[in-house]
Amino acid sequence: SGLKVALVDPAAPRKPDESAMDLRVSALSRASERILTAARAWDAIVPHASPYCDMVVWDAASTPERPDALRFSAAETAEPNLGHIVENLRVQWALHESPLLRGVTEVRSALAGLEFDEGSARVTLEDGRRLACQLVIGADGSQSVARQLAGIGRSGWAYDQTAVVAHLHTGKPHRETAWQRFLPNGPLAFLPLQDGRVSLVWSTTPDEAASLQA
């Protein structure tokens, strides 16, 4: 591309070993797979990803067998599956190791200041170093320091929900199916992982979440 790129992050990515486990998982759609393939990261992700070919959604007053449950199936499309469930650390490491990032300079520090001029920016790091650039991309989450330093506002609201996450071995096989039940306090999801495991994601009130973890 001819661009010089610096990636500023105070923490180096952690290389996962074969037994590594991350309670944070993502559902990667077929479109996400195409993006990660173009980024030359998918081949490193797919050995650790579990495809899901079906999805079943129902509410608290129903059961997954009833006709009012929603069902989505890859068999109804021209695709081999609906997507994959994979632990986040696998995606992060695969992207970090992508050949497309070999020309990127990694800077182990945190953002401390931003100044903008016409067509340029100056970045000050916590260790005192300064970087001059034409473009700053803030990809540092909902509490983005880059956004705050750039003076960009935001709007938001509280959902009064907390997610409890865990990996489980269930009494019955997951059958490459994502299961989601909507309860009065929030959705409960069982997402298929490798080795017969499922990822439990239970969104509920803070009080019930504390009770579940007690």
Task: Give the residues covered by each predicted segment.
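Short, histidine-centered active-site or binding-site loop motifs used for metal coordination
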Residues: 12, 76, 204-206
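Residue-level detector of anion-binding/catalytic polar loops
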Residues: 4, 42, 105, 153
